[in-house]
Amino acid sequence: MTPTAPWSVKGRWSALALAATVLLASMSFAATEAAPVRIGIIGTGKIGAALAELWVRSGHEVMISSRHPEGLASLAARLGPQARVGTAADAAAFGTVIMLAVPYASTPQIGHDYAKQLAGKVVLDAGNPYPERDGPMADAARAKGAGPSSKEFLPGVRLVRAFNSIIAGNLLTQANRAGDRIAIPLAGDDPAALKQAAALVRDAGFDPVIVGDLSQARRFDVGSPVYVKLLTASELRAALNIK
């Protein structure tokens, strides 16, 4: 057998360059679970602002919105060119995915006013009904469960309950933490919407745990044993008896 000639310096550098390219591509894929999407954030308080920052870091485009969008200019400037500012109507039209992070009493009006823009879209709902803030409708939503209630308020969307069971301060401090990541419970009726939501949870720096359909969202509603608890995925599954 004829001995193989040793690689030339040029050949070695070519191989190293190829290996580096493959490694960088794999690292990029691992860093962003969801293909880059446009996310319209309706309600840019602490929750909405934190998620906007986390998703921009992961390569997604966001539109942050409020009733007074001029007040969001400094946040948008800090987030960079992947962030835009608009009204709630603008965000509803902009996003292929919608993040709803408003006081719960506003949910029915949003469903009514932006039904056309939201139709058929994946909507992540982080709202929680608090009677002291939202009035009697919150009592009814708690009795029925936030999942079925939001589904009624937001007809025609592909609804997923998400990010309602973590306080705003923990979104930035706990995202991508070392070791086992914090879990975010999800519930929805649409498997494809749940898959999209789970990918965006990972991109935000957390581990998704699918609890069930929207009727099961009450298991992580306000007042549930796991509400706002910092649990890993295995701890959350154990607490909710999810196999």
Predicted regions and their residues:
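Rossmann-like NAD(P)-binding element
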Residues: 80-122, 126-134
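Bacterial N-terminal signal peptides
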Residues: 14-26
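Bacterial N-terminal signal peptides that target proteins for export
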Residues: 2-17
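A glycine-biased structural micro-motif
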Residues: 36, 94, 120, 156-159
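Internal alpha-helical scaffold of NAD(P)-dependent oxidoreductase catalytic cores
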Residues: 153-159, 177-217, 222, 226, ...
